[in-house]
Swiss-Prot record:
It is found in: Postsynaptic cell membrane; Synapse; Cell membrane; Cell projection. It comes from Danio rerio (Zebrafish). The chain crosses the membrane at residues 256-276, 283-302, 314-334, 421-441. Glycine 2 binds at residues 97, 161. This is Glycine receptor subunit alpha-2.
Length: 449
């Protein structure tokens, strides 16, 4: 072999080796990639990806000085706890999931399409500074270990999931209580990064998921949930914010059993006095006072679990009207008693008039004696017999007295008779207007809103 041929062969062999080295270093050859990855341990790979020797800095956001980082969020609701009217808040247990792309974490030297890392690695990477704007209290879960998930994909996409229990503020409008529909909001906001650096968005598919069979004691969670943006403007800048609104429809079965039906029965019980004899004053008065006091206690109990708001609620109107009907039934007997006693007052007035007339006759010197059909009159010291005088006959007095007594008693009985029909009819009319207004008109209006 000639010298030029050997030189040419050597040059070709060197070029081939250079090409092979380039393909190995660039990771484009699958076979060489497999052999290289098998020789690299996971610990070495993680150190190379985000360790001290990688040059990765968790203090700097992805695309620094470039476009903002888009973070897609979705939540999974494990449980929806108690909704408290007095403090106007609600408790919820969720999985919060955030996903964003960090080009510095993209890899090709490892065969797996994604890496599930220990939660302790969260301190080694950059994370969004998300917080809940309407949060009143929160806590993490660490039984039996930290309930956190970190997953990194080949293209640098990072999935961060965490389990939280939150107490969130929920301003309530209780005008239609207990037939109200409440709208409770959850707001996710960036604390320090403005919209030039960070933007939150809802996941396109299934942004808010609810566990199967999730129920609340007093509320029904509607299927529709309003998703939107709630961008906040402060003196320090414009901050990204997304929100979800939960529509909670109150189930009034508890209040129907504990408040409406007992108060209804108390009102009906107060009407029993209309069938009791008006002469049985102790029985009717005791029944009236008992129902009034019971209704007052019931009304106070209905407000014990509610905040001291300045407006009138639906339950307040119901309790006030029931108390009014019970008190009116007690006043009705007072009126009946007063009318029935007018006959005694009338007789007392007649006796007073006759006594006054006799006194006037004595002062005028006239005195009448009636005996054995002979009338004797003493006038000016002289006795005059057979004087014609208008005498009040005793049978006539008794007859007039009985007539007057019967007239007043009939009036009192008529009041009781009218009340037996008027009170139930008035209460029925009130119920028709009350339930149509609150259960149909206002309730449907709240559902549409």
């Amino acid at each position: 072999m000639t010298r030029p041929s050997v030189k040419l062969l050597t040059t070709l062999l060197a070029c081939l080796m250079e090409m092979l080295n380039f393909r190995v270093s660039s990771g484009k050859d699958p076979d060489l990639l497999s052999s290289s990855s098998s020789s690299m341990s996971p610990s070495d790979f993680l150190d190379k990806l985000m360790g001290r020797t990688s040059g990765y800095d968790a203090r700097i956001r992805p695309n620094f000085k470039g476009p903002p980082v888009n973070v897609t969020c979705n939540i999974f609701i494990n449980s929806f706890g108690s909704v408290t009217e007095t403090t106007m808040d609600y408790r919820v247990n969720i999985f919060l999931r955030q996903k964003w792309n960090d080009p510095r974490l993209a890899y090709s030297e490892y065969p797996d399409s994604s890496l599930d890392l220990d939660p302790s690695m969260l301190d080694s990477i950059w994370k969004p500074d998300l917080f809940f704007a309407n949060e009143k209290g929160a806590n993490f879960h660490d039984v039996t270990t930290d309930n956190k998930l970190l997953r990194i994909f080949k293209d640098g996409t990072v999935l961060y999931s965490i389990r939280l229990t939150l107490i969130l503020s929920c301003p309530m409008d209780l005008k239609n209580f207990p037939m109200d529909v409440q709208t409770c909001t959850m707001q996710l906001e960036s604390f320090g990064y403005t919209m030039n650096d960070l933007i939150f968005e809802w996941l396109d598919k299934g942004p808010v998921q609810v566990a199967d069979g999730l129920t609340l004691p007093q509320f029904l969670i509607r299927d529709e949930k309003d998703l939107g943006y709630c961008t906040k403007h402060y003196n320090t800048g414009k901050f990204t914010c997304i929100e979800v609104k939960f529509h909670l429809e109150r189930q009034m079965g508890y209040y129907l059993i504990q408040m409406y039906i007992p108060s209804l029965l108390i009102v009906i019980l107060s009407w029993v006095s209309f069938w009791i004899n008006m002469d049985a004053a102790p029985a009717r008065v005791a029944l009236g006072i008992t129902t009034v006091l019971t209704m007052t206690t019931q009304s106070s109990g209905s407000r014990a679990s509610l905040p001291k708001v300045s407006y009138v609620k639906a339950i307040d109107i119901w309790m006030a009207v029931c108390l009014l009907f019970v008190f009116a039934a007690l006043l009705e007997y007072a009126g009946v008693n007063f009318v029935s006693r007018q006959q005694k007052e009338f007789l007392r007035l007649k006796r007073r008039q006759r006594r006054t007339q006799k006194e006037e006759d004595l002062q005028d010197g006239r005195l009448h004696f009636s005996s054995y059909n002979t009338t004797t009159c003493v006038k000016d010291g002289a006795v005059v017999k057979n004087t014609q005088v208008n005498q009040i006959q005793q049978p006539s007095i008794l007859k007039n007295t009985e007539t007057n007594r019967k007239k007043f008693v009939d009036r009192a009985k008529r009041i009781d008779t009218i009340s037996r029909a008027a009170f139930p009819l008035a209460f029925l009319i009130f119920n028709v207007f009350y339930w149509i207004t609150y259960k149909i008109i206002r309730h449907e209006s709240a559902r549409k809103d």
